[in-house]
């Protein structure tokens, strides 16, 4: 029997309201015991003194680019970034080439990620065949094959009747629709519609492109009983709309990309195309509302929207591919809120663990006895720099490149096996 003890760490598990200095005994890949001073002579020991010990992080929004665009990232490099960022489970987006609208692609991803053997990779299927927004994909067989949600991420579903049908089907299958909300008639440009787009003379994306679709899909979720999960929420009004539906008891949840908490549209003036993302970085007022939304629990979880693109695809803002990498920077970014006294570490961990687990309906994100021993161990104060040496992605598109970051994952354990060590 393989035994491991994580000793002397400060354990925080929001799923069972557990917080304090404890040892964790892992046996055969499962959580066996959490107690003070566990002694098992034959067990391997990980000394976590001075470190935070919590359930393995879950990221429900990752672009692995595999199959089809493996020059940007692949399942192996993406998995390496994930475990280095503390994520033991990631949900990958279906805008691959070919897209995940058939079971062959699902099986390929599941097999390859298993053979890489670092983190759990849970695929999503497309809402519509070919992500074309017209014909609904075969949800039933995609779910059977292992998809945990459906999304046309990267593109909105413009046709309301298609979205209604998708929510009806998803409701029958008990899975969420993950919703990239941006009406493409109002969001066709490259950055937020506002002072910076005016200053630089750049084409833009209006905030109401997002808000209108959230309102529509909240109504459709109410009508169908389906669960709509709003991806990368980015404006103040979006949050007000989400709160409205939550108060009515509609099944609506949402995530925030930590980059939207750190930066505004003005970051384009510093980082150029590396600050180009869809939905775009918004105004200060929006950024502050998002932070408030985290604090008040209107936002359910962090999700990185890790979206790798090569440097040649990020030269000019006007022509750049949208997206920012984020698996390795999510924890230090979120810790900024903790350091400013806005949220507790417990709240931060909840948003990386049990909350995303609940959204996709998996029994993970917890250290409950008998659960898979997925454990993240981090130092909230360790400083490091994301650069050539530390970056594990094939891409480097982030405004945080070369910046000093505070907070570092020291060990990541998945199913009782160490998959990352600083
Ligand atoms: O900025 C983005 N990049 N937003 C998306 O929705 C898609 C993603 C990508 O695939 O690059
Ligand atoms: Zn998206």
Curated annotation (Swiss-Prot):
Task: Write down what this protein is called.
Answer: Dihydroorotase
UniProt key word Lipid biosynthesis? no
Catalytic reactions on record: (S)-dihydroorotate + H2O = N-carbamoyl-L-aspartate + H(+)
Q: How is its activity regulated?
A: The monomer has very low activity by itself. Activated several thousandfold by formation of a complex with PyrB aspartate carbamoyltransferase (ATCase).
Tell me which species this is from.
Aquifex aeolicus (strain VF5)
EC class, as a word, reads hydrolase
State which pathway it belongs to.
Pyrimidine metabolism; UMP biosynthesis via de novo pathway; (S)-dihydroorotate from bicarbonate: step 3/3
Cross-referenced InterPro entries, in alphabetical order?
Amidohydro-rel (IPR006680), DHOase (IPR004722), DHOase/Allantoinase_Hydrolase (IPR050138), Dihydroorotase_CS (IPR002195), Metal-dep_hydrolase_composite (IPR011059), Metal_Hydrolase (IPR032466)
Q: What is the effect of changing residue 232 to A?
A: Does not affect activity
């Amino acid at each position: 029997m393989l035994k491991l003890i994580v000793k002397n760490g400060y354990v925080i598990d929001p799923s069972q309201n557990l917080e304090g200095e404890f040892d964790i005994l892992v046996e055969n890949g499962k959580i066996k015991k959490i107690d003070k001073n566990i002694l098992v002579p034959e067990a391997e020991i990980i000394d976590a003194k001075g470190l935070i010990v919590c359930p393995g992080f879950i990221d429900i929004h990752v672009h692995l680019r595999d199959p089809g665009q493996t020059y940007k990232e692949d399942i192996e490099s993406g998995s390496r970034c994930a475990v280095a960022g503390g994520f033991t489970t990631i949900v990958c987006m279906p805008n691959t080439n070919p897209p995940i609208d058939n079971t062959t692609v699902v099986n390929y991803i599941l097999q390859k990620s298993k053979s890489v053997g670092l983190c759990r990779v849970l695929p999503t299927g497309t809402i519509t065949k070919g992500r074309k927004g017209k014909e609904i994909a075969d949800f039933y067989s995609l779910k059977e094959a292992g998809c945990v949600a459906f999304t046309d991420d990267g593109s909105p579903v413009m046709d309301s009747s298609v979205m209604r049908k998708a929510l009806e089907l998803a409701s029958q299958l008990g899975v969420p629709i993950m919703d990239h909300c941006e009406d493409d008639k109002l969001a066709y440009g490259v950055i937020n519609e506002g002072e910076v787009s005016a200053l630089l003379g750049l084409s833009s994306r209006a905030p109401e492109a997002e808000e209108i679709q959230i309102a529509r899909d909240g109504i459709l979720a109410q009508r169908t009983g389906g669960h709509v999960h709003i991806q990368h929420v980015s404006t103040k009004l979006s949050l007000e709309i989400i709160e409205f539906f939550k108060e009515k008891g509609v099944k609506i949840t949402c995530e925030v990309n930590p980059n939207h908490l750190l930066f505004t549209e003005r970051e384009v003036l510093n980082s150029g195309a590396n600050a180009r993302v869809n939905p775009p970085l918004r105004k200060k007022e929006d950024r502050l509302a998002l932070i408030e939304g985290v604090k008040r629990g209107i936002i359910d979880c962090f999700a990185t929207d890790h979206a790798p693109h090569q440097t040649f695809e990020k030269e000019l803002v006007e022509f750049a591919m949208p997206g920012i990498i984020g698996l390795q920077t999510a924890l230090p970014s979120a810790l900024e809120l903790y350091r400013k006294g806005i949220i507790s570490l417990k709240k931060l961990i909840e948003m990386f663990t049990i909350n995303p687990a609940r959204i996709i309906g998996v029994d993970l994100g917890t250290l409950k006895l008998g659960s898979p021993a997925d454990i993240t161990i981090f130092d909230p104060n360790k400083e490091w720099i994301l650069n050539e040496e530390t970056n594990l992605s094939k891409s480097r598109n982030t405004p945080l490149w070369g910046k000093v970051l505070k907070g570092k994952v020291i060990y990541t354990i998945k199913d009782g096996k160490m998959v990352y060590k600083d």
